[in-house]
Regions:
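Conserved SAM/AdoMet-binding glycine-rich loop
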Residues: 4, 107-231
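Residue-level recognition of specific faces of alpha-helices
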Residues: 66-67, 80, 149, 186-189, ...
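Generic structural signal for secondary-structure transition and capping sites
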Residues: 36-39, 143, 170, 243
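Proteins enriched for Cys/Gly/acidic motifs involved in redox and nucleic-acid/cofactor modification
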Residues: 1-122, 175, 197-204, 208, ...
Length: 258
């Protein structure tokens, strides 16, 4: 919100300071220089395309599992999504940094880590590494009993990742894969980077090596340009998938979506 509509927030009564995505983690630095003034709040932001900072974090809150952020931002610019404008370009921490975070979790008694990010399969753009490299190294951290991979794009879920999870002692056979639509025509409207044939092949690959794997799938309905025929095509496609769970959302039209 602050990255997308800073002026709107600055006009809210009693708002003194609005920080963008790159500045928010250093809020104390800005508070020292903040002076109460009449008028709208002070805005300090960076253009989304210029955001380069990655701040690794690992949180648990009141949960029994930890969430380790390995990547942030997205370069995909799907027509229904504002994340690239709110979170900036794809970037990530180094494998060495993230392994230290996992080791800290293990030392504190944590047993499960969920790997999170905006587009985690795109991991490595900042460091010249790959998500598969990260998976293999984290699998060697003693003390962690289970990892889960959060939502990963089907075109970035490689066979080598699937095969590795199938034989890993620590990576759970648990996948969350955004389909968004089961209609190839709608996928084109969305500017997605795969078609239904590729998506189905990923499901079949997972089930061929992990018959009991859990597979969750995201769907969006009602996007601009989706006809009744396209919707029915999507329903038929989904019925033919061997999956465990559906997350279904209605399209939400917002500024910067198409």
């Amino acid at each position: 919100y602050a990255q997308l509509k800073p002026e709107e927030i600055a006009h809210i009564p009693d708002v003194d300071l609005v920080l963008g995505a790159e500045q928010k983690l250093n809020i104390l630095d800005y508070l020292d220089d903040l002076h109460k003034q009449k008028g709208n709040g002070t805005i300090i932001t960076t253009q989304s395309q210029d955001i380069r900072t990655f701040s690794p974090s690992c949180s648990r809150g009141d949960r029994t599992r930890y969430f380790l952020k390995v990547q942030d931002g997205c370069d995909y610019y799907c027509t229904y999504c504002t994340i690239p404008f709110a979170r900036g370009r794809s970037r990530n921490g180094s494998i060495a940094e993230l392994v230290k975070q996992a080791e800290t979790v293990a030392a504190s008694g944590g047993k499960e880590i969920v790997l999170t990010g905006v587009n985690i399969g795109d991991f490595g753009k900042s460091t010249g590494e790959s998500f598969f490299d990260l998976v293999k190294v984290l699998d060697r951290v003693e003390g962690i009993e289970r990892y889960r991979i959060s939502s990963i794009e089907p075109n970035l879920l490689t066979d080598e990742i699937i095969n590795y999870v199938a034989t890993s002692r620590r990576f759970a056979p648990h996948f969350h894969i955004p389909l968004q639509s089961g209609s190839d025509e709608v996928l084109k409207l969305m500017h997605r980077r795969y078609d239904t044939a590729l998506f189905k092949s990923k499901i079949q690959k997972i089930k061929s090596v992990m018959p009991d794997a859990f597979i969750g799938v995201d769907l969006i309905v009602g996007v601009r340009g989706e006809t009744e025929q396209f919707f029915n095509d999507a329903v038929r496609f989904v019925y033919g998938l061997d999956i465990s769970q559906l997350h279904v959302f209605t399209y939400s039209e917002r500024p910067n979506t198409q």
